[in-house]
Amino acid sequence: MFDPYLDELNKLLIVNHGEILLVPDGLQECYSKKQDAVIRSWLWSVPGFRRWRVTRMDVGDKLQVFNSVAYPDYLNEQPIMGIDLLWFGIKNKLVAVLDFQPLVQEKSYFDRYYQGLKSLKARYSDFNSKDNVRAYDLSNYFSPWVLLCKGDLFQASSSLPFVFSEFLNAYFDISNNFKKYNSRIEPNRVKELQISYDIYSSAHDPAHGLFKSYFGKQWSERFLKEFLFPHSIAKDKT
């Protein structure tokens, strides 16, 4: 179900001069020993970004997962990009969460970087869900305009393709023009905030339990610390 989104993102990263990097050994692909499931991940080097990761999990008709997170360079204070798409085939249920995840919860920061996301939120009512998704703590590292959809096949086949494309374009519009935003957060502080994001996310990642159930605790712990949120390791060593 989500392969077209993977292809679209890959093409966009290539257009923006992205290059594939090596994923830590043993984490680029894993097959479940208990169930018919596979997870694959990619890491990109993209100008203007410190790290751009992508993950695709395939459990056939039962479950489909697509995730991507982009970390801007430390010289760029723009939000972290986060995408989570989940399709529960047995229940015909879509959960989609797309956001420019803010480094700080400040009005001036929102005024600088969220006009595009605000516009998307206003135009796509399907992604303006008032219901929180239990797995996500929307009070931390989410913006007031997070695109949240709890839908079914109708939303998955109608509005999601357009939201996905426009969301990516809005995010790249910020990065391609970041100099005009007059970044006000110093690079060292941006680094600290991105480290804090990884530390928090590694402790609260809603997908970690899912990964453990399919791929085991040992592999999932490595995946969490070494691929998903590698900056969280700094805390473990202090």
Curated annotation (Swiss-Prot):
Pfam families: Fe_bilin_red (PF05996). It comes from the Bacteria. It catalyses: 15,16-dihydrobiliverdin + oxidized 2[4Fe-4S]-[ferredoxin] = biliverdin IXalpha + reduced 2[4Fe-4S]-[ferredoxin] + 2 H(+). It is an enzyme of class 1 (oxidoreductase). One of its GO terms (molecular function) is 15,16-dihydrobiliverdin:ferredoxin oxidoreductase activity. GO terms for biological process: phytochromobilin biosynthetic process. Gene3D superfamilies: 3.40.1500.20. The keyword Oxidoreductase applies. InterPro entries: DiHydbiliverdin_OxRdtase (IPR023658), Ferredoxin-dep_bilin_Rdtase (IPR009249). Keywords: Oxidoreductase. Its EC number is 1.3.7.2. Catalyzes the two-electron reduction of biliverdin IX-alpha at the C15 methine bridge. Belongs to the HY2 family. This is 15,16-dihydrobiliverdin:ferredoxin oxidoreductase. It comes from Prochlorococcus marinus (strain MIT 9211). The gene is pebA.
